[in-house]
Amino acid sequence: MSYTALVKNELVSVPELQTECELAQLSALIRVSGTLSMHGPGKFAVRIVTETGTVARTVISSSRRLFDLGTSVEYRRSIMHKKRNYLLEISNQDSLAEALSALGIYIPGEGLVSGIPKSVIRTKQAQRAFLRGAFMAGGFLADPLKDFHLE
């Protein structure tokens, strides 16, 4: 297991007690590793790809707990790189538009939100949760015991 995967697994185990922190974390996860598809007025689908199983479980459990969203999971293994990929899809559901609005990703009648909305990161705890989610979605950390490199 890579050093980055170990760090992500450790971050997933950080207890989230406040709903606003879980919202901020899920918002970052979707913003960084998600793809939003629009299928007509008010009809959306979100697709998230991750290599880490614990991150996939976090997205599934948070979206279910916060918004009662169903998520389909597809597991693929890359032959060339010998890595796992988890493909999560939240297809068009009644509460998906409301969820995207609460996560600060989409505003009905206005469109996609650029930047990080202040409503998502009001407190220091929510800001930390947002950064944690962004790292879990697309971060990399080199093992400090090995050679360093710059990306």
Task: Identify the meaning behind each predicted range.
Residues 1-60, 66, 114-151:
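Intein-associated homing endonuclease modules of the LAGLIDADG/DOD-type, together
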Residues 62, 66-115:
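A generic, well-ordered mixed alpha/beta core segment in the N-terminal half of proteins
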